[in-house]
Every structure is written in C-alpha cells, then in structure tokens.
Amino acid sequence: MSPAVDTASTAKDPISVMKSNASAAAADQIKTHEYEHLTSVPIVQPLPITDRLSSEAAQKYKPNLPGGFEEYKSLHKESLENPAKFYHERAQLLNWFKPYDQVFIPDTEGKPTFENNAWFTNGQLNACYNLVDRHAFTQPNKVAILYEADEPGQGYSLTYAELLEQVCKVAQILQYSMNVKKGDTVAVYMPMIPQALITLLAITRIGAIHSVVFAGFSSNSLRDRINDAYSKTVITTDESKRGGKTIETKRIVDEALKDTPQVTNVLVFKRTHNENIKYIPGRDLDWDEEVKKYKSYTPCEPVDSEHPLFLLYTSGSTGAPKGVQHSTAGYLLQALLSMKYTFDIQNDDIFFTAGDIGWITGHTYCVYGPLLQGCTTLVFEGTPAYPNFSRYWEIVDKYQVTQFYVAPTALRLLKRAGDSFTEGFSLKSLRSLGSVGEPIAAEVWEWYSEKIGKNELPIVDTYWQTESGSHLVTPLAGGATPMKPGAAAFPFFGIDLAVLDPTTGIEQTGEHAEGVLAIKRPWPSFARTIWKNNDRFLDTYLKPYPGYYFTGDGVARDKDGFFWILGRVDDVVNVSGHRLSTAEIEAAIIEDDMVAECAVVGFNDELTGQAVAAFVVLKNKSSLTAASESELQDIKKHLIITVRKDIGPFAAPKLIVLVDDLPKTRSGKIMRRILRKILAGESDQLGDVSTLSNPGIVKHLIDSVKL
C-alpha cells in the first residue's frame, strides 16, 4: 500500500482544533507501550461448527460463509473494489416500497465519499416493516422477543404476530393521542423490557425519529438531550427494576421536564404499578389505557432511504453530548449484514445481547439486527450479579441461547467472582460468543473461551462505535476467520482501514504498524451528521485527518494482519464500555461553589477497564491543610454525589485527588498527560515538562496521588 496522504498536505497545520490534542495523546500512548509482542500471540482456530452440533442440527446448518477465510477475503476485496455491486446484491435482503436509483453517489473512481455520503438514493422503505411485518406475515407464530425480568422466573415471550399488534397500537397512540408526526423526535427513557422495543418500532413505523436516553442518566442529562433533540414527546415507565433495586424513572422524567417547555405529552408504561406515582392530567398518558382505544393494525409510513432513523447521544471531547444521527436504509442493511456474517445467524437462533438499548449495542444487536434477521432476541432486564453470579448462564440454558454478546467489564466481574458460578450449566446451545464495548484482555478472553466456550466456540471480539452503527473490525463466527486472544482481528465488509501516524497523518505501511485508526471511505451505516450541528460532525470526525474518518482510537496492526485496538486517544474515557466525556464530568464538578479548577482523566481499572479520576483545586486552598481527614473525605463524597446527580451514577469518579494546582503550560493549558502518567505509576516517564509554568507542582501531584 502507498500512503494515502502526501507529505505536502500533511505538513500543514491540521484544520481541526482537536487534532493536536489527539495526535499528542496518541503519540504519547504509542511511545509508552511495546506492541511488537502482539505478533507472537498464537492464532486460534475454533472447532468447526458441525463438529459441535448433533447430526440432525449439522444437516440443517448452512454457514453464511461456507468458503471460510478465503471467501471472507474475496468478499471483503469486492466490497472495497466494487462496492456498488456488493451492496446492491445484499440490499435485496431488505423489503423496499420504492426501488432506489443508485447504491451511493460515486466519485470518479466509482467509490462512495464522505463529502456525498448518501446510500440507496430515492429508495423508500420502512424499518418497522423490515423488522416486524414481513416476519409476522411469513412466520407469525415464531417467537420474536424472549423477556427475562429482573426477578428470576418472571418474564414472557412475544411472537412476531403479537409484536406486530402491540407495535401498531402504540404507533396509533403516538399519532392520534400524542400528535406525533413524521420527522418528529420522540425521547425514550425506558429500562430493558419488551415495551422499550415496541416503542422504538412504533416510532419508526410512523416515520418519526427515536432518541433513546439511557435510563441511568440523571434528570439533568435527560433534560439536555430532550432539549437538544427538541422532543415534544417522552415515553417512560412508572419505575424500573434492576439488580433487585427499584429505580424511579417517572420521577426522573418529571424532574427533567421542569425545563423542557416544548414537551406536551408523556406516555407511561406501568412496570411496577406503584400507586403512589404522580401523574399530571393533560400531559401524562397511561399506556395500558391508551392501547385499548386502537385497532390491531395500522400501515407503515414509507420513508426515504436517507430519512433519519434515530438519534443517539454519545460523549464528545468538548463536553456537550453529540446527537449522532443515523439514516434508515444504510443502517438497516449494515446491521443485517453484521448479524448475518459476524455471528453466522441462522433462522432459528436465539440471540442474547447483554447490553442496554440506551447505547448503540442495544440498538443494533438487541433490536434491529436480530429482528431484521427474523430470529429471536432475548431482552434481559437485570444484571449479571443478581441474584447471583450465575444469572447469565442460567438464562443461556433456560432459553437455549445460540449467541451471547457482552462487555468485557461483565466478564471481568464474573471471572473475579469465581469459576464455581459457571459450573453445572450445559451451555451446549451456544454457537458463538461475543465481546463488545472495549478491548478484551487476553486473560479474560481465555477465561471466556475456556469456561463458557469449552475451548470450542469462536469469540467475536467486535470493535465499533455509536458513529459506525455496526461492526468495523471483528472476527467472523462459523470458522470464517482465525482469532487471536485480545485482537479485534479483521475489517468488516465495506470497511477500508488505515493506520495513520498521529502527527503527520501519513498512512503507516509494512508488516507492523502503530498509530491512530482511521477509515478511508464511508460505509452504509456510518452516521450522517450530528443533529443540528454538522460543523461539529466535520470538526470531530472528518477534519482531523482530511480524507479519513478519525475514530479517536489508537491501533496496532501485526504482521499477520490482525488489528489490535489500543484505546482512546482523545479526551473520552471508556468505563465499562460506556464512553464518557472528561469535559462533561469536569463541567459538573466545576459548577460546585467550592471548586476553582478541575481536570478529569481516565486510568486503568481491573474491573471496569478504565475509571474516572478527578484532580480538583478548591477555591479555598487553605482548607486542604486546615481540614481534618474526615472533612476532606466529605468534600470528595460531595463531589462524587454532584457528578452522580448531574450526569448519572456510571460517570461518578472512582478517585478524587484534592490538589493545590494543576500542571499547566505557560499558555494556561492543563497537561492531562502528566496526570495520566502519574496515575499509571509512570512518574519517571513524564516526557518533556519544559513547557510547564509551574514545574514544582509535579512532586505535589505525585505525593497527593500516593495519599
């Protein structure tokens, strides 16, 4: 390969304000690790699937890539060299109300471009029809949703016919009781229950746009997302259940809506039937009462291929959450293809994604992907630790799950709990295991393979993002690609990866490469924009390295062609697979009257992958020396509670360090790199600190962390 960016163009200053931060962080990260050992990690070939199946099941099984790795390489090459042909053939897997004119808007070489990123132009379809109607017509009694409630033994199933009826009734509530129109945004703040999926499907059925907010966010965060999307309608529950605890979702919504004047209606599903929940007449509607008013069928609204399907807010390095906007046709197709090929989905499969619909994993691989394929999706309301650490494996055996997809954080928790919780379960129904949200450490990968996969199952260690909509780098189940413990492996179809030098932007070639991960051209499910802020979309993703999509992650490629994801190189922390903006957390802390300055960074954590650390300077600096230890602890607890209330419990700092000052350059910029190094125990590897205006602060910071 030859460099895609010439030295003349890369010698200029970057046009994005964030490139200097990203390149410095990436360069620092790369210098502090040795990645040459990755090549020595052994390649693992899973046992052929037919060897693990009964003779009857083996006869029925038809792999989606029967030609294995060679077929993958051939199809991947075709998806890059002839994308129009590749995607046109596979677009027939969707049902269209109106055929499209062309697959994408091509450049002079017949390839898609970031500048004109539109797919299946002038075609019309409907997401809900593709997820529900077509399967309800052909296999009405097939189970679409299996629901496992927080409490064991509670739950139920919905067939595709039953799902269609419930979706149609909620769609009519939206249209006629709540006056939701095509193109309106609808905010969804719900737990992992079937009604959450029904809600999303009903919204898409009428051509509206869903904006799901994770039901762990605070009222302030919910308010900000409702206002940014200008949602006039909110759908929620009275309460929710998780890990044996009750969460007051309706109360949180009510608090958020004190500052959302545009909201006219709230639809409430009664999950717990708590009679003490307050309802506001004229605004709040009872789900159970409303569904009684409407008939069991209403037609779908055709929408253009590029019609916005949903918004999903993700953390940004500048603090304010970004409403990532996905279009309909391209997202649907790539979600379907990733289900088909990554997981080697068969029609009778039961797919269990242990992820929340408040994040992209729940969107693509709990809702859209499985239902597009016409298989069964399992919705789990609870946690892996309630009522005990065997819960996941009980569910797998109970429902005969065929694919299990989970974040490494949960696996680390279960590994730490002890192997006894994995014993006594068959797990024979499983055909593949998945990992999502963050890189999985080799030792966790090996535990997952041995204890859950019996050293027989493929582990698809998937790398992707809210912005990508579906998998970017992943092994393929069904024995289609080899694996290495801890490696994301190979690019998915349509994904043209590049490893760039973080400073120059020049593509790194050769057997071994390290740098930042970028992508050379768009793919169907690539996000179209940031809601109402396309300039921010360009500045964040396309301007840091012109001609490329900048993922924000560091990467290494070994001599065997495997890609290894090395973590964030921007000011985003990945905690338990959740991307959190350090700037947003800093803003929450600085709002407190006692705080003068704050710098938030991530540090390695054995359980959550990364954790949040906040270095805080108080306005009254004398209190650091005058206060007792218990008073200092009270200050720290107060600041943690502040973040929990302003953003959500999952964003709370694990470590707060009260300091006299922060390390700053002469221009006043905080050198967060120094803070990260100190937390990593690398105080002897701080690098160039000559630009510090207060070099004496370094020893104070080191001593403060040790306390």
Swiss-Prot record:
Its EC number is 6.2.1.1. InterPro entries: Ac_CoA_lig, ACAS_N, AMP-bd_C, AMP-bd_C_sf, AMP-binding_CS, AMP-dep_synth/lig_dom, ANL_N_sf. Disulfide bonds: none annotated. Gene3D superfamilies: 3.30.300.30, N-terminal domain of ligase-like (3.40.50.12780). This is Acetyl-coenzyme A synthetase 1. Its main location: other. PROSITE patterns: AMP_BINDING (PS00455). GO terms for biological process: acetyl-CoA biosynthetic process from acetate. Belongs to the ATP-dependent AMP-binding enzyme family. A motif (Microbody targeting signal) lies at residues 705-707. PANTHER family: ACETYL-COENZYME A SYNTHETASE, ACETYL-COENZYME A SYNTHETASE 1. SUPFAM superfamilies: Acetyl-CoA synthetase-like. May be required for assimilation of ethanol and acetate. One of its GO terms (molecular function) is AMP binding. It comes from Kluyveromyces lactis (strain ATCC 8585 / CBS 2359 / DSM 70799 / NBRC 1267 / NRRL Y-1140 / WM37) (Yeast). One of its GO terms (cellular component) is endoplasmic reticulum.
